[in-house]
């Protein structure tokens, strides 16, 4: 199938903000595709060429793409950069530049979806001394045959910035609609496999029954079950009846997979960080059985046995070089709290059974590997739960988790069966969409940041400017990132791609017509830069409203 047909779909999606229309457009297109193309489009429709959990990436920067565009249309990279600055986007710049194209490609064949998909995957395979030239050649081969509209979306895909307003939820609904399958079945398959290309093919070839057969596979990460804010401890314990109450650690949530003697470690965003944690791999090799499993836990950084801040473990996980040195500087501890797979899938088993099996298989002899500190919460043991909370705070942890002991593990769900009870003010994870440069001595820094939440259609809605909680080093870092993600600048105002996630604390939510959500935050303070999160992980307008109604 011609790539132009997919490009026409991209354009139609970009030109509507209505979720139902987007779903219908994608659904109609999916029905036209053979299985091979369907698997490719299941990824390309989200601007991806690999499943979310894959550690492969295109790895191409703006300058390389601009160089290739320049060669394709016969202008210098500086001219391309000027066009990007004028248009605010590489895709729109291509539309402008291709209209003035001075070079003509003779006997070129129309681009196909298959050719584009395979060419993009080749980009991830190129490394070494001559890799830059080889990558440019691959991009140039596509761009030289591309129309202006094809170049628009091709360059955006290479830079992983498709910008057509489509998220996983819309694609899920489109698959369900196209192949007449219940949305909940597609949703479960998505949470278990995190591969919409695979799901689309199974839906087409095997229908609802085939999707129901998809299950956990060690080596392929599953979206984590999520927690929401807990009401007072007695209220929630009385409601649950029996709860497992655990210390809430200030670290990075991990899924550790063992499959065929290989151990892989994934973050909550499905990022493979095995390379950064060799000592954790060694611990699991030595102190857990040599069976296939998926365990979940939290890894924290320590010093003299005491927990360090979240930023310390984040720096450690992000380290790509000198890992041995990092291991000495930032010792780690792992606290395990759930077992999703042991020889067979266990997520449909109640938490109590999963916890007991976890206790059976983990050898906690070394200090570096532990089970989460836990008490059973019942109406008769509320004092013990409150004592665990006080102990957790005294040990410099965040608070406690309260989980319904009778519940299965539901990937991707944020609900009342898993709750967090924290001492700190409640926070929201929000993405930066713009900012304002300071004045005077801070004129070179972006000093105030415009932050947004997701609505039900995955559109970003502004909620506040935040300007406190940032020291000079953090301002310098954020300003550098803002320039890297800049879309446009006017006076002191800057608009950026939604890439930077901030954890923001506040004293109160108030109604405000000034922002797109209809609400704002009183006394917002940046608590953390959440480098472990992306725009898909930020909080929602729905949660903001829920917090407003219950504050």
From Swiss-Prot:
UniProt catalytic activity: ATP + (deoxyribonucleotide)n-3'-hydroxyl + 5'-phospho-(deoxyribonucleotide)m = (deoxyribonucleotide)n+m + AMP + diphosphate
Full protein name: DNA ligase
NCBIfam families tied to this protein: dnl1
Protein task: DNA ligase that seals nicks in double-stranded DNA during DNA replication, DNA recombination and DNA repair.
Protein EC: 6.5.1.1
UniProt-annotated catalytic positions: 248 (n6-amp-lysine intermediate)
Gene3D superfamilies: DNA ligase, ATP-dependent, N-terminal domain (1.10.3260.10), DNA ligase/mRNA capping enzyme (3.30.470.30), Nucleic acid-binding proteins (2.40.50.140)
Biological process (GO), any one: DNA biosynthetic process
Organism of provenance: Methanobrevibacter smithii (strain ATCC 35061 / DSM 861 / OCM 144 / PS)
Binding site for ATP: 246, 253, 268, 298, 337, 414, 420
Source organism phylogeny: Archaea, Methanobacteriati, Methanobacteriota, Methanomada group, Methanobacteria
Molecular function terms from GO: ATP binding; DNA binding; DNA ligase (ATP) activity; metal ion binding
Keywords for this protein: ATP-binding, Cell cycle, Cell division, DNA damage, DNA recombination, DNA repair, DNA replication, Ligase, Magnesium, Metal-binding, Nucleotide-binding
């Amino acid at each position: 199938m011609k790539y132009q047909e997919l490009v026409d779909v991209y354009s139609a999606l970009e030109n509507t903000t209505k979720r139902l229309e987007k779903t219908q457009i994608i659904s109609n297109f999916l029905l036209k595709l053979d299985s091979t193309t369907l698997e490719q489009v299941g990824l390309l429709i989200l601007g991806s060429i690999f499943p979310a959990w894959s550690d492969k990436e295109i790895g191409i920067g703006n300058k390389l793409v601009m160089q290739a565009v320049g060669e394709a249309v016969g202008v210098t990279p500086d001219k391309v950069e000027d066009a990007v600055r004028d248009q605010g986007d590489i895709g729109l710049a291509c539309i402008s530049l291709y209209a003035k194209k001075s070079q003509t490609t003779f006997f070129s064949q129309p681009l196909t979806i298959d050719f584009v998909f395979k060419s993009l995957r080749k980009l991830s395979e190129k490394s070494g001394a001559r890799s830059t030239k080889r990558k440019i050649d691959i991009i140039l081969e596509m761009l030289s045959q591309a129309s202006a509209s094809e170049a628009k979306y091709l360059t955006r895909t290479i830079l992983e910035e498709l910008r057509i307003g489509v998220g996983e939820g819309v694609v899920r609904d489109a698959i369900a609609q196209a192949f007449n399958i219940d949305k909940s079945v597609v949703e479960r398959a998505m949470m278990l496999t995190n591969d919409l290309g695979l799901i689309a093919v199974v839906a087409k070839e095997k229908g609802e029954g085939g999707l129901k057969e998809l299950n956990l596979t060690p080596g392929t990460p599953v979206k984590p079950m999520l927690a929401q804010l807990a009401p007072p401890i007695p209220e929630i314990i009385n409601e649950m009846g029996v709860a497992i109450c655990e210390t809430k650690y200030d670290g990075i949530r991990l899924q550790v997979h063992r499959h065929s003697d290989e151990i892989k470690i994934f973050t909550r965003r499905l990022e493979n960080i095995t390379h950064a944690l060799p000592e954790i791999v060694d611990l699991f090799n030595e102190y857990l059985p040599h069976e296939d499993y998926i365990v979940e836990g939290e890894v924290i950084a320590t010093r003299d046995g005491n927990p360090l801040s979240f930023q310390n473990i984040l720096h450690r996980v992000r380290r790509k070089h000198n890992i041995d040195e990092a291991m000495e500087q930032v010792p780690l501890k792992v606290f395990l709290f759930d077992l999703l797979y042991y020889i067979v899938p266990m997520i449909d088993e109640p938490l109590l059974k999963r916890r007991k099996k976890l206790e059976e298989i983990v050898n906690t002899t070394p200090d570096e590997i532990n089970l989460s500190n836990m008490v059973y919460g019942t109406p008769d043991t509320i004092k013990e739960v409150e004592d665990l909370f006080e102990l957790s705070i005294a040990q410099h942890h965040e608070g406690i988790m309260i989980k319904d002991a009778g519940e299965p593990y539901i990937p991707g769900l944020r609900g009342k069966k898993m709750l967090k009870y924290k001492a700190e003010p409640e926070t929201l994870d929000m993405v930066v969409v713009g900012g304002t440069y300071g004045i005077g001595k801070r004129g070179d820094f972006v000093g105030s940041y415009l932050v947004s939440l997701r609505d039900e259609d995955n559109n970003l809605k502004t909620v506040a400017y935040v300007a406190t909680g940032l020291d000079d080093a953090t301002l310098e870092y954020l300003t550098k990132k803002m320039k890297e993600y800049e879309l446009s600048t006017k006076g002191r105002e800057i608009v950026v791609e939604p890439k930077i996630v901030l954890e923001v604390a506040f004293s109160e939510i108030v109604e405000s017509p000034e922002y797109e959500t209809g609400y704002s935050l009183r006394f917002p303070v940046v608590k953390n830069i959440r480098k472990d999160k992306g725009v898909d992980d930020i909080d929602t307008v729905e949660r903001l409203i829920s917090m407003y109604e219950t504050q």
